[in-house]
Amino acid sequence: MSFTTTVKEELIHLSASDQTELSAIIKLAGSLGLANQSLNLSITTENAKIARYIYALIEDTYHIIPEIKYHQKTNLKKNRVYTVYLDKQVDKLLADLKLADSFFGIETGIEQQVMSDDDAGRAYLKGAFLAAGTVRDPESGKYQLEIYSVYLDHAQDLAQLMHKFMLDAKVIERKNGAVTYLQKAEDIMDFLIIIGAMSCKEEFEAVKLLREARNDINRANNAETANIAKTITASMRTINNIIKIMDTIGLDSLPVELQQIAQMRVANPDYSLQQIADSLDFAITKSGVNHRLRKINKLAEDL
């Protein structure tokens, strides 16, 4: 099951909001038809549970019994498209939800009452996501939540509504409409809270934190590997210089304090400067070891 489906199935198990939610669903997933000189309304979805939810929402709100139809896009079961079909009292429903102008392209944005009321705004966002929303699985590490609108005006109003809830929503035009989207993980989690998908918000956050922890561990491991490689490279340079001294003037020609450092370095090529300092039988700091190794390198280079 996709994360989008998980979110939507959590939403339909919440108590239905109100007519505002139904209004958003119909506006984004509905289409009008004409048969026998009367209007009919079709609301489409690819999820049978959402179709039943819309059916119940219409029945409970308006005491009208719709039909649920379905057809196959292909031979695969998952490509079924479900339609909640209504051919009675469509005019009344559209008028009550103030949707008539929307379907005839006269008023394609979001009603001002929804834009100005927080509860109505939450209900509208819930309905909009149920009808036309998608969200990437947080496991992908590429965070994106989108709601598709047929009209650019509606997509822009949707972004403005999200801005009211302090979400950094943006709009992009597509070939057959426009998309309102969020790309920040924190915004997506806040959106899930706003529409009531608390369990999915917790799941999203847990996956995000786990990914970040894994990335931190990988970065630390990479840094440690790089430091080890750097230590060994520097160590081999010094060891080659010590061998050069041994072959030319002999190690005994060096001061005692340099001889001890040289012997420790040759015996332990993978030791860090601190490990060399800790292994000597006299007190010396990490910088002291580094200073003496630089002296050895300089002596070898001058030979």
Curated annotation (Swiss-Prot):
At the top level, the lineage of the source is: Bacteria
Coiled coil ranges (UniProt) are none
Picking any one GO biological process from the record gives: regulation of sporulation
Q: Where are the transmembrane segments?
A: none
MF GO annotations: DNA binding
What Pfam families does the record tag this protein with? HTH_WhiA, LAGLIDADG_WhiA, WhiA_N
- According to the entry, DNA is bound by residues in 272-303
Keyword annotations from UniProtKB, A to Z: Cell cycle, Cell division, DNA-binding
Query: Into which family does the record put it?
Result: Belongs to the WhiA family.
- Give the function comment from the record: Involved in cell division and chromosome segregation.
Q: What is this protein called?
A: Probable cell division protein WhiA
- Gene name linked to the record: whiA
